[in-house]
Amino acid sequence: MAKLQIKLVRSVIGTTPNQKKNVEALGLRKREQVVVKEDNAQTRGMINKVSHLLEVTEIAE
């Protein structure tokens, strides 16, 4: 299964509480932090909710 590299490029200051929770659920706390997650429907849904704050790249295995 492919993986996604997710980077927080914008701050969560000024976003809604639900967006902040989504970013935290993805494992991101600080700007410029990078995490690697499995590419599945749940992760894609969370990314879609806060796509304006993130930079996402696919990692082929």
UniProtKB/Swiss-Prot annotation:
The keyword DNA-binding does not apply. InterPro entries: Ribo_uL30_ferredoxin-like_sf, Ribosomal_uL30_bac-type, Ribosomal_uL30_ferredoxin-like. Pfam families: Ribosomal_L30. It comes from the Bacteria. GO terms for molecular function: structural constituent of ribosome. CDD domains: Ribosomal_L30. One of its GO terms (cellular component) is cytosolic large ribosomal subunit. Keywords: Ribonucleoprotein, Ribosomal protein. Part of the 50S ribosomal subunit. This is Large ribosomal subunit protein uL30. It comes from Clostridioides difficile (strain 630).
